[in-house]
Structure formats: structure tokens, C-alpha cells
Amino acid sequence: MYNIIIIVLSILAVTAALVFAAHFLPSRKLDLENGSPYECGFDPLNSARVPFSFRFFLVAILFLLFDLEIALLFPFPQALFIFNSSHVLYIATLFLAILLIGLIFEWTQGGLDWAE
């Protein structure tokens, strides 16, 4: 019981010391550069409607889909010890075959061609 009281009091003391230091220590003066917004190198006063490559968007969505599907493969090694291993291997092979068919389809449709 006394340990909890000591911990709470020490946390309160550290918090009070930090608040006291933040209140009484001098703050830095802001100049023009510190007061202006920084938008990753873009001018924030221009229009936000910039052209965006649909090709990049398609590749990003495909990456997310295939990444999620690959993450679904993580439980299969553990399932080999729990269930019938031939059944689990059949399901994993079927799952990978579906992924491969989807990848080949996207490749033949030109979804992975970066330059046209």
C-alpha cells in the first residue's frame, strides 16, 4: 500500500516540476519562417487540386490487396500442427494459386506497367 502512495506522489512531483519548468522557462521567439505553415515542400496557398497519376493509385491499391492476402498466409504454419497437414497444404496451395492467377491477370491487363 505504501509503495503505491510513494509512486503516485513521485509521479505528481515530476508532473508539477515539469509544469513549473514549462511555465517559467523563457520561450523562443518565433520568426517569419517558424510562423509560416509547412506542407511538405508545397505552397499551402495554391490550389489543393493537383493532378494525380491513376497508374500510381492502381499500383498502390494492388499492393495493399496482395499485402493483405499474404498476411492471411501467416496462420497456415500453425494450422499444420493443429489440423490434418495434407488438408492445410491443399488449402494453402489453392490460396496461393488464386493469388497467382490474380497477379497474372493484372499483369496481362497492364495494371503493373508503370510506363506506357
Swiss-Prot record:
Subcellular location as annotated: Mitochondrion membrane
Disulfide bond sites: none
Protein name (record): NADH-ubiquinone oxidoreductase chain 3
UniProt superkingdom: Eukaryota
Membrane topology recorded in Swiss-Prot or TrEMBL: Multi-pass membrane protein
EC number: 7.1.1.2
Transmembrane segments: 4-24, 56-76, 88-108
InterPro entries, per database record: NADH_UbQ/plastoQ_OxRdtase_su3, NDAH_ubi_oxred_su3_sf
Cross-referenced PANTHER family: NADH-UBIQUINONE OXIDOREDUCTASE CHAIN 3
Molecular function in Gene Ontology: NADH dehydrogenase (ubiquinone) activity
Cellular component terms per the entry's GO annotation: mitochondrial membrane; NADH dehydrogenase complex
Family indicated by similarity: Belongs to the complex I subunit 3 family.
Ion transport as UniProt keyword: no
Keyword annotations of the record: Electron transport, Membrane, Mitochondrion, NAD, Respiratory chain, Translocase, Transmembrane, Transmembrane helix, Transport, Ubiquinone
Gene from which this protein is expressed: ND3
Record's function text: Core subunit of the mitochondrial membrane respiratory chain NADH dehydrogenase (Complex I) that is believed to belong to the minimal assembly required for catalysis. Complex I functions in the transfer of electrons from NADH to the respiratory chain. The immediate electron acceptor for the enzyme is believed to be ubiquinone.
